[in-house]
């Protein structure tokens, strides 16, 4: 996707920690977590309706939009983030039904990393 105009910059370690802590409360089959961005705040939210549990954590981020929510598989995002050595990660969005592009803020050396993550439907 080349039309991802919304960009979020977040501390990689903080995002990994927030996903690990909240995903404990996600549905074990889907691993669905919801990323809600309002101005410069990212809320990572997970819920397991079957067991009536939920968790959320809010992080400070840089975001060039106003408000955006997207559902993703938390375990897949963790796997991608574990491969990023940079201190900050860029997530690029266009709309909640389109793929997310994930890249390190600063590409190193002569290689360029780009990860693609498909969203999930938020119930």
Task: Give each language-model segment a name.
Residues 3-123:
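DNA polymerase processivity clamps
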